[in-house]
Amino acid sequence: MRWQWRIYEEPLQEPLTTAQGVWRSRSGIYLRLEDEQGQVGYGEIAPLPGWGSETLNADIALCQQLPGHLTPEIMATIPEALPAAQFGFATAWQSVGRLPYRVRPWPICALLGSGQAALEQWQQSWQRGQTTFKWKVGVMSPEEEQAILKALLAALPPGAKLRLDANGSWDRATANRWFAWLDRHGNGKIEYVEQPLPPDQWQALLSLAQTVTTAIALDESVVSAAEVQRWVDRGWPGFFVIKTALFGDPDSLSLLLRRGLEPQRLVFSSALEGAIARTAIFHLLETWQPCHALGFGVDRWRSAPLLTTLTAYERLWERLDQ
């Protein structure tokens, strides 16, 4: 299987502020494979080192080292330390001769902007039929965020659900105060709090989940199948947020599901990947059958429409050759 690779860097349509900082652009690698019959496939490597994946430089080094002709045996040598590369090559290989995929729309969770902007943005998403929302916390002081959140919870209609994402920014004392506040003011609208504590505080995370009433989801703590299995073995009672583009070969998640991991505990989420990776993920969802609104409501920052023709893939690829 012959293959080529091209690096991309795209500015975000507007900066995305999280507890880890401000994102202004997104970089990655597009892959193009072609077999002896001339059938093509495409993949995307979109690492996010702040979320536990490798760096883009590590993926560039891999692409420079691999031979110009791929085989399954060669791809099997891609190390687990490069999960975004594993995903990109695996999905590219699987797509050869099968594009375009038929993909369906799934319910999407709308990501709201930080601060006061959330009080206006939810209405636009609600009018588009979205009923699940996500808001980043840990960006301002707890008092400022709780004042905004109280107004947001009062404004959200019946049936709306809200996810709070701390991106691991709280310490245990802050988390305790937040969960006590949510017990008083949550109005039954909080679906879960995502990654309240840093990933290295696993014992505190487990203790917290066992003592609070609001559900907790792990995100940065579970960037690989091995980490999900580790948390299952620890008795984790909450959700797992799966950033599929950073998770490695998709077969690793399929194996966990076959071993008994309950699909209703999984929430699939974007890593601000591009259209090639997003379309591959939505194709995989036909097998995984998600039970919750997808965390892909990020078009305000990076628009990545699903690719429905082979020409659409070719245009993306050729754009990087200009």
Swiss-Prot record:
GO BP terms: menaquinone biosynthetic process; phylloquinone biosynthetic process
Residues annotated as the enzyme's active site: 136, 243
The protein's required cofactors: a divalent metal cation
Positions of Mg(2+) binding: 165, 194, 219
Pathway field: Quinol/quinone metabolism; 1,4-dihydroxy-2-naphthoate biosynthesis; 1,4-dihydroxy-2-naphthoate from chorismate: step 4/7; Cofactor biosynthesis; phylloquinone biosynthesis
Gene3D superfamilies, alphabetized: Enolase-like C-terminal domain, Enolase-like, N-terminal domain
Gene Ontology MF terms in the entry: magnesium ion binding; O-succinylbenzoate synthase activity
Top-level taxon in the UniProt lineage: Bacteria
EC number: 4.2.1.113
Similarity-based family: Belongs to the mandelate racemase/muconate lactonizing enzyme family. MenC type 1 subfamily.
UniProt xrefs under PANTHER family: O-SUCCINYLBENZOATE SYNTHASE (PTHR48073:SF2), O-SUCCINYLBENZOATE SYNTHASE-RELATED (PTHR48073)
Protein function: Converts 2-succinyl-6-hydroxy-2,4-cyclohexadiene-1-carboxylate (SHCHC) to 2-succinylbenzoate (OSB). Does not show N-succinylamino acid racemase (NSAR) activity with N-succinyl-L-phenylglycine as substrate.
Quaternary structure (record): Monomer.
Protein name, entry field: o-succinylbenzoate synthase
Species the sequence originates in: Thermosynechococcus vestitus (strain NIES-2133 / IAM M-273 / BP-1)
Lineage: Bacteria, Bacillati, Cyanobacteriota, Cyanophyceae, Acaryochloridales
Gene transcribed to yield this protein: menC
